[in-house]
Regions:
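Short, high-confidence coil segments that cap the C-terminus of an alpha-helix
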Residues: 110, 149, 280, 406-407
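Active-site nucleotide/adenylate-binding loops and adjacent lid/helix of ATP-dependent enzymes
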Residues: 56-218, 265
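Hydrophobic residues within alpha-helices
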Residues: 26, 79, 357-361
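ATP-dependent carboxylate activation and anion-phosphoryl transfer catalytic cores
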Residues: 1-32, 171-193, 245-349
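Extended, charge-rich helix/loop segments that form flexible
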Residues: 194-255
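Hydrophobic anchor at the start of a short beta-strand
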Residues: 37, 90, 113, 152, ...
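Structured, non-catalytic alpha/beta "coupling" segments that mediate domain-domain communication
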Residues: 25-45
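Phosphate-binding loop of NTP-binding sites
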Residues: 335-452
Length: 452
């Protein structure tokens, strides 16, 4: 019996169901401040706070994020143009749509090249350090596969180290140097054995389950190994470093080192200015430079990309260096000091009289100027308008009210059945009322006495 296959399947289910590291970190920070949350879909769309006081996040895009800023960042051509116009260092490049234009673009830009889709993200479709037209043709086809628009960028390959600068609320909060997945030879082990050894690091796991991701040997990896003159069964010479992925993303097995405290002030100022140029409250700026402690203009480095919805993982848990709580400034912006996103909640339970009590309290709240949502055994009401009929005294009905952005006061009938079946739709309330406890429902769910 292959137990490991079942364990791996469970890992995959967990990765599919749980919040990603970036979303999860923001939710954890919210919870630490007493801010309630509701997951709105099976992915990364989350509501923080209740009713009229709610904010939303989807990974690291928030309800405060500029839509036009996201559109600009997702279009590398627009991003590069705006940065170029603002005298920000960017690589020389060209935009093409057809393969027949590739040779001319290569001659214009000059080798070595980077080829990538104009609308790509997370490193998809990117090929770097291209040194011939033959390589460029393969890279062009790869970029096309990852592009929705079919528009491809051909730009100069800038040498140096890959840095990610994270700017939140127009302030640099973290910086990391990223290294692509790689192995270093010892003169004895095959490349596959070296990969297995790297993957045995307890910090590496499947997907986002740990701070690092295991290195997989896909077709791209095999191509890079072949281009270096090896196969997976080759013994790598001692101290030789073999790159296994085109990009330095942690999700493909890369590593990250925190360098926040050594970024040159000119580069800090540039990153913060870029966030305003692109108009993003949260952005990840990718820079290639030989030395982040010097201004970009002194090293010949360049800004490669500006990313909306950047990943936080490399900053929350870098491979080396100081972890940064980059979720904190996100919550600072969404919920200024003293705000917790809550609305008043009155919850009513008991054997008899719950609905009458709920209606009475909702009426009193409405007469005092509140926009009331309430649940009863005959339906859900928002400002006395019936929106859902039937017995609506369970947790899903409570969530219905707490999700409504027009509600600033909730009165929730919470019947015994829903409590036993699925609990409450909220983790705490301001006022809890038990009308009475009678013998009406004895004998159900293992309850046989009033004392029970």
């Amino acid at each position: 019996y292959a137990l490991e296959k079942d364990i791996q399947k469970m890992r995959e289910i967990r990765e599919d169901e749980r919040l990603g590291p970036s979303t999860g970190s923001i939710v954890e920070e919210a919870v630490s401040r007493g801010i309630p949350w509701i997951r709105l879909n099976k992915y990364s769309l989350v509501q923080l706070g209740y009713g009229a006081n709610q904010k939303r996040i989807q990974a690291t895009v928030t309800s405060e994020t500029s839509s036009i800023g996201v559109e600009i960042a997702c279009d590398k051509e627009d991003t590069k143009y705006l940065l170029e116009q603002a005298e920000v260092e960017v690589p020389r490049g060209d935009i093409i749509r057809k393969e027949r234009s590739l040779e001319e673009a290569c001659n214009y830009v000059g080798f070595p090249l980077v080829i990538k889709p104009v609308d790509g993200n997370h490193g998809r479709g990117i090929t770097v350090d291209i040194n011939s037209l033959k390589e460029a043709l393969v890279a062009f086809a790869h970029a096309k596969e990852s592009s929705r628009s079919g528009v491809i960028i051909v730009e100069k390959f800038i040498t140096g180290d890959d840095y990610r600068l994270l700017v939140i609320n127009n302030q640099l909060v973290a910086a990391a140097i990223r290294t692509p997945a790689h192995v270093v030879g010892n003169g004895k082990s095959t490349i596959q054995e070296l990969i297995d050894e790297v993957n045995s690091d307890p910090r590496r796991g499947y997907g986002h389950e740990k701070v690092l991701t295991q290195i997989t040997t896909n077709e791209l990896t095999k191509t890079l190994i072949k281009d270096a003159g090896y196969t997976l069964d080759s013994v790598l010479p001692e101290d030789e470093r073999l790159i296994l992925k085109d990009t330095a993303n942690l999700s493909t097995g890369g590593t990250a080192e925190d360098v926040t405290d050594i970024v040159h002030p000119a580069n800090v100022s540039m990153a913060e200015r870029i966030s305003k140029i692109i108009d993003l409250d949260i952005c990840g700026i990718d820079i290639m430079t030989s030395d982040i402690t010097k201004p970009l203009s002194d090293t010949g480095g360049a800004v490669l990309e500006v990313n909306a919805g950047p990943g936080f993982r490399m900053h929350l848990a870098p491979t080396t260096g100081l972890p940064r709580n980059v979720a904190a400034p996100v919550i600072d912006k969404l919920f200024p000091k003293g705000k917790n996103g809550r609305i008043p909640i009155i919850a009513i339970t008991g054997t008899n009289g719950k609905t009458t009590t709920t209606r009475l309290l909702a009426h009193i709240a409405k007469m005092n100027g509140h926009r009331v949502g309430y649940t009863t055994s005959d339906g859900v009401y928002i400002q006395n308008r019936l929106l859902m009929t039937g017995d609506c005294t369970g947790p899903s009905s409570a969530e219905f009210v707490l999700k409504d952005p027009t509600v600033n006061f909730a009165v929730l009938e919470s019947a015994r059945g829903g409590l036993l079946r699925a609990g409450l739709g909220f983790e705490k309330c301001d006022v809890a009322i038990v009308t009475n406890v009678a013998a009406d429902h004895l004998g159900l769910k293992g309850i046989h006495t009033i004392e029970q």
